[in-house]
């Protein structure tokens, strides 16, 4: 695969010499290996600037042979995206257009990459690693293909269940746990489980679950370190945890519902009602 991506060149840069007067063979495979193994930003830049055709072939055609085709098994109407990579200047990690999926490789160089440590918080850096690339790409593309309808104002419940739905589908398709897909460390999972009932009762009792206040929605959905309204030691993304539980209960209660049907379902009040999810009752 990589040999076919190499090219003959008389330029003595990153090459294997065959003879003093012979041609030079550029080792594209070495660039890929250094980028994958060492998170080499220099190698990544070279792949995209000096050898764009080879990199485009690798990303758009070779990698497309694999798991990117899997969603069609769950939903035949799923559109396989045309993929490309880019250097975004630390802008958006994933860019989605009409059947297009752009991946900013400079946002996945490892959480301890020096530039990240200088400009990003710990909670932001925890997903800036290549192990997150697949989940991020799938999440943003699925969210684009199966969006919340724009004919109504959406509540926290809508976002909780919608995020939970997309992540649940990704975990199912990738055959990994819900916690692994969401990036929940053991400490956070323990807190969620111990405080699930109290958090749910607080959301219900204060009318937050049915609130369309974007500030409150962001507070419970986005990475931010802590969730102040619940307590100074409470972790972030509590809404995502609750959404995963709601969808998991719903799918276990409706084994005949397909992944495709779930993706097209946007009535989240119905899903909550039919899921049987109620933390205090579930713990009995």
Regions found by a protein language model. Name each.
Residues 2-5:
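C-terminal motif of bacterial Sec signal peptides marking the signal peptidase cleavage site
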Residues 7-69:
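N-terminal mature-domain "stem" immediately C-terminal to a signal peptide or N-terminal signal-anchor/transmembrane
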Residues 64-189, 260:
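Acidic/His-rich structured neighborhood in mature extracellular/periplasmic domains
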Residues 67-70, 168, 202, 242, ...:
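Amphipathic alpha-helical segments that form well-ordered structural scaffolds
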Residues 71-79, 173, 177, 203, ...:
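Sec/Tat-exported extracytoplasmic proteins
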Residues 156-164, 190-194, 233, 237, ...:
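Soluble non-cytosolic domains of exported or imported proteins
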Residues 164-227:
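Acidic/His/Gly-enriched intrinsically disordered linker/tail segments
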Residues 211-284:
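C-terminal soluble interaction/assembly domains
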């Amino acid at each position: 695969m990589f040999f076919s991506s190499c090219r003959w060149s008389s330029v003595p840069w990153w090459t294997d010499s065959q003879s003093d007067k012979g041609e030079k063979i550029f080792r594209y495979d070495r660039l890929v290996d250094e980028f994958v193994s060492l998170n080499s930003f220099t190698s990544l830049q070279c792949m995209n600037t000096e050898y764009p055709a080879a990199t485009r072939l690798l990303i758009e055609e070779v990698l497309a042979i694999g798991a990117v085709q899997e969603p069609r098994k769950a939903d035949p109407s799923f559109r396989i995206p045309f993929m490309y990579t880019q250097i975004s200047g630390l802008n958006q990690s994933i860019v989605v257009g009409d059947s297009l999926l752009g991946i900013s490789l400079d946002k996945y160089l490892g959480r301890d990459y020096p530039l990240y440590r200088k400009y990003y918080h710990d909670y932001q850096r925890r997903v800036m690693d290549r192990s997150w690339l697949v989940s991020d790409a799938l999440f943003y593309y699925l969210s684009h293909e199966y969006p919340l309808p724009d004919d109504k104002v959406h509540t926290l419940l809508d976002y909780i269940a919608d995020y939970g739905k997309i992540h649940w589908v990704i975990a199912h398709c990738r055959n990994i746990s819900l916690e692994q897909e969401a990036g929940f460390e053991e400490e956070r999972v323990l807190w969620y489980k111990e405080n699930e009932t109290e958090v749910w009762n607080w959301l219900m009792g204060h009318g937050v679950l049915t609130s369309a206040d974007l500030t409150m929605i962001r507070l419970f959905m986005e990475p931010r370190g802590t969730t102040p309204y619940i307590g100074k030691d409470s972790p972030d993304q509590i809404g995502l945890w609750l959404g995963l539980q709601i969808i998991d209960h719903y799918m276990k209660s409706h084994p005949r519902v397909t992944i495709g049907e779930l993706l097209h379902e946007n009535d989240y009040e119905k899903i909550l009602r039919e899921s049987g999810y109620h933390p205090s009752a579930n713990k009995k």
